[in-house]
Each structure stands twice: as structure tokens, then as C-alpha cells.
């Protein structure tokens, strides 16, 4: 199934966790490196966490452990290498090592159009390459569709799988009626609150052309500087009211820059 207990073993199998956390919720031998932000050059990061506690929100040492509620530093998919921390994507964890296999072909700059069906069984895919040419690829055993919350239902509907009301009006032959396809998407509403810093503690310190180049060089050679860490290194999961059983609001602390095109009043910190 898809319950928490059912999927937790797979998350643990994927993870290689570095740091202090609730061990029963983490994996330590997987290919995807995960560590809590250890950034030291963001003077406002820990101040944000302190302010959250002063506002009455608890501190949690592990968002992905026993207690999600609270404020803390985020965990990132980062791997500590001899040249410092490096972003560690799922491509680096899974795809790059597998590219050496003789039975794997990887195509880039293509768009999957639809599934090739044999009755109600998927036997391959049709895709369009960067030259605009339509190509076909067939599977010996199975096809795994993993194109995201928007891409997956779009491919299914173009293949004739989904709600007939959504499919047939576009002249697509219905293969299988499944009314949930493309429905029930849940997304976050985001509200940005920006503050004017009176001291040089934001990314403005690296905003000039020469400073941007220096930041990139420091990251590539030493794994340090503003380019070495995500701008969002801390946050919180909180309840919008005490009556809530579980946190229903997420806070992000972002060390960033904004461009103001219209007169705007910003609070100073």
C-alpha cells in the first residue's frame, strides 16, 4: 500500500543520512546523501530559529523524525566531498552510476507524448526528439511512468486513460475510464514576507558581477561561500491555531534578494 508504514522502508533504503536524527526514521546505507544544513555564514539563520521559539513554537531536531512540528534547520540532499559540500540529486545517486551499464540507454531533450497500448496493456512509449521527430520505444516487460504531478496525468490522458469528459472532446480514443486521472491535485499557497536588512548579511554581498564570479569559484574549488548552500536553510512546521491536531502551515526562512519594481514599504531588521 501507500501508507506511511508501507513506504517508510523505501525512503530509508534510498537515504544515506549524515547527522543527528531519530535513527528509526532514517537510512544510512542508501545512495542519496542527506545532511542537516551546517551553514555558518548566514547570521540570520539561527536568529530565525530563536525567534520562532520566542514566538511559542517548539524546536525540533529532526523534521523527518518523531516530531515534525517546530522550527529548525532543514535537511538537504548534499554530499560532503573532498572539495566540500556538493548538491546530490537523484540523478547523481541513481542515474549516473547506472549509465555505465550496457543494457541502459539514456535519451535527453525529448518529450514523451503518449503510451503505446496493446489493448489495455502498455507496451511502449511515443516520444518527440529535439529535431521534432516522432520516435517509438518498446518494453520487454514493463513501462514505468514517472513524469510528475502534472506530466504523468497529461501523458495518461493523451494515451486515452482518464475521465472520458476530458479525453474524447480532444478526439482521443478512450482506452480506459479512470476518472481520478488529473484530479485531486493539492498544492501549497505561498505568501512572501520580505524584510530590509540594515547590515550586509544577505546575498546582496555577492550580487555584483565580480562577486558572483568569486562565489562560483569558491564553490567549485573549496565548496564554500554563498553558492555552496541552498538559500532556504531553515524553516518550520507549525499549527495555525492551537486547536489543530497537526501542523498545517510551513514557514521558510530564505536568505535571498528581491527586486522591487513599485514603491513598497519593507520592515527593517
Q: What are the functions of these language-model segments?
A:
Residues 10, 115, 124-216:
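Glycine-rich loop(s) and the adjacent beta-strand/alpha-helix scaffold that form part
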Residues 235-239, 250, 265:
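Cofactor-binding catalytic cores of oxidoreductases
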Residues 1-122, 128, 192-215:
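Conserved redox-cofactor binding core of oxidoreductases
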Residues 207-238:
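Extended catalytic-interface subdomain
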Residues 127-133, 238-245:
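Short acidic, glycine-rich loop/turn motifs
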Residues 28-30, 108-111, 121-123, 170, ...:
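Residues that flank catalytic or metal-binding motifs in active/ligand-binding sites
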Residues 4, 59-61, 108, 164-168, ...:
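Acidic/polar loop patches that form or flank catalytic/metal-binding clefts of enzymes
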Residues 258-269:
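Single conserved hydrophobic/aromatic residue that forms the stacking wall/gate
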Amino acid at each position: 500500500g501507500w501508507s506511511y508504514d508501507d513506504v517508510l522502508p523505501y525512503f530509508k533504503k534510498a537515504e544515506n543520512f549524515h547527522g543527528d536524527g531519530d535513527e528509526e526514521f532514517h537510512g544510512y546505507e542508501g545512495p542519496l546523501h542527506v545532511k542537516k544544513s551546517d551553514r555558518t555564514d548566514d547570521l540570520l539563520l539561527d536568529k530565525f530559529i530563536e525567534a520562532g521559539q520566542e514566538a511559542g513554537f517548539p524546536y525540533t531536531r529532526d523534521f523527518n523524525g518523531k516530531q515534525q512540528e517546530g522550527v529548525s534547520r532543514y535537511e538537504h540532499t548534499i554530499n560532503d566531498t573532498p572539495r566540500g559540500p556538493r548538491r546530490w540529486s537523484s540523478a547523481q545517486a541513481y542515474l549516473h552510476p547506472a549509465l555505465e551499464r550496457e543494457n541502459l540507454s539514456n535519451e535527453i531533450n525529448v518529450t514523451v507524448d503518449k503510451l503505446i497500448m496493446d489493448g489495455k496493456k502498455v507496451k511502449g512509449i511515443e516520444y518527440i526528439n529535439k529535431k521534432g521527430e516522432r520516435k517509438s520505444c518498446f518494453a520487454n516487460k514493463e513501462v514505468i511512468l514517472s513524469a510528475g504531478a502534472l506530466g504523468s496525468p497529461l501523458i495518461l490522458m493523451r494515451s486515452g486513460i482518464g475521465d472520458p469528459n476530458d479525453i474524447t472532446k480532444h478526439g482521443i480514443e478512450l482506452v480506459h475510464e479512470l476518472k481520478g486521472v488529473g484530479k485531486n491535485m493539492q498544492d501549497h499557497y505561498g505568501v512572501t514576507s520580505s524584510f530590509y536588512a540594515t547590515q550586509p548579511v544577505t546575498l546582496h554581498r555577492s550580487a555584483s558581477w565580480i562577486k558572483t564570479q568569486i562565489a562560483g569559484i569558491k564553490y567549485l574549488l573549496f565548496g564554500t561561500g554563498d553558492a555552496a548552500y541552498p538559500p532556504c536553510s531553515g524553516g518550520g512546521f507549525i499549527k495555525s491555531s492551537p486547536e489543530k491536531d497537526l501542523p498545517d502551515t510551513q514557514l521558510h526562512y530564505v536568505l535571498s534578494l528581491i527586486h522591487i519594481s513599485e514603491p513598497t514599504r519593507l520592515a527593517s531588521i
